[in-house]
A protein has these predicted regions:
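Short acidic low-complexity segments
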Residues: 76-91
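Glycine-rich, N-terminal phosphate-binding loop of Rossmann-like dinucleotide-binding domains
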Residues: 97-99, 139, 193
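Rossmann-like NAD(P)(H) cofactor-binding subdomain of soluble oxidoreductases
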Residues: 103-174
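Internal alpha-helical scaffold of NAD(P)-dependent oxidoreductase catalytic cores
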Residues: 152-169, 174, 179-204
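N-terminal glycine-rich dinucleotide-binding loop that anchors FAD/FMN and/or NAD(P) in oxidoreductases
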Residues: 52-80
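N-terminal Rossmann-like NAD(P)+-binding domain of SDR-like oxidoreductases, especially those catalyzing
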Residues: 6-8, 15-17, 21-22, 42, ...
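NAD(P)+-binding Rossmann beta1-loop-alpha1 motif at the extreme N-terminus of oxidoreductases
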Residues: 1-59
Length: 204
């Protein structure tokens, strides 16, 4: 897959190390690393992360070996940036959605995730037909959620899985204090509703 731009929605403990590593990792065919843009919604509690990243600083607290240097080097090289504007997703080849999902009682709480996907879907509607960007949900989802919730949500915006977008799920497990190590070295489970999607997710 010829990936030139990746958008990472949510610079938390999953999204930030993924964005940093992707921005310095050459493709398997030897082509340069993709340009990576981190998308963080403007909010009183998290909006500051955009300025921090654009200044070359990781917004993740605590000691995370290697992360600060990777972020600083990638920003200095012009391969990593951050924005509040979800429309940065509109020309991305791959969109990684790394928004935390919690529980409300025994049921999963998808409010923040769906809010993020609303912005992603609005942005992707601007793309030319047939470009089929890959949208990978890195959040933890209950079984069948891609089929019963995510795909119908995108369809409401006229984005049909397999035709207009390729929807995939690849939940990430991380460990504070070892974020870079876990993201770089852990095996990944990849899934999608369309038969092509797992192959594309694995290659992204």
């Amino acid at each position: 897959m010829n990936t030139k731009k990746i958008a990472v929605v949510g610079p938390g403990i999953v999204g930030m190390p993924m964005a940093a590593l992707l921005s310095v990792s050459p493709a398997t065919d030897g082509s340069p690393p993709p340009r990576v843009v981190v998308v963080q919604r403007k909010s009183p509690t998290s909006g500051w992360k955009v300025d921090a990243i654009n200044e070359g600083r990781s917004p993740i607290g605590g000691v995370e070996p290697g992360l600060d240097k990777i972020v600083a080097d990638a920003v200095a090289a012009g391969r990593l940036s951050a924005t509040h504007d979800t429309y940065a997703c509109s020309d991305a080849d791959v969109v990684l959605v790394c928004v935390q999902t919690d529980k409300s009682g025994l049921a999963p709480e998808y409010g923040p995730l769906m809010e993020a996907l609303d912005g992603v879907a609005l942005a992707l509607r601007k793309r030319p037909p047939g470009t089929r960007p890959l949208v990978i949900i890195e959040s933890t989802l209950a079984p069948s959620t891609m089929h019963s919730v995510i795909a119908p949500f995108f369809a409401k915006y006229g984005l049909i899985d397999g035709r207009d977008v390729m929807l995939g799920n690849s939940p990430n497990r991380v460990m504070p204090g070892r974020l870079v190590e876990r993201v770089a070295q852990s095996d990944k489970l990849v899934a999608g509703l369309h038969p092509e999607t797992p192959v594309l997710v694995a290659a992204a």
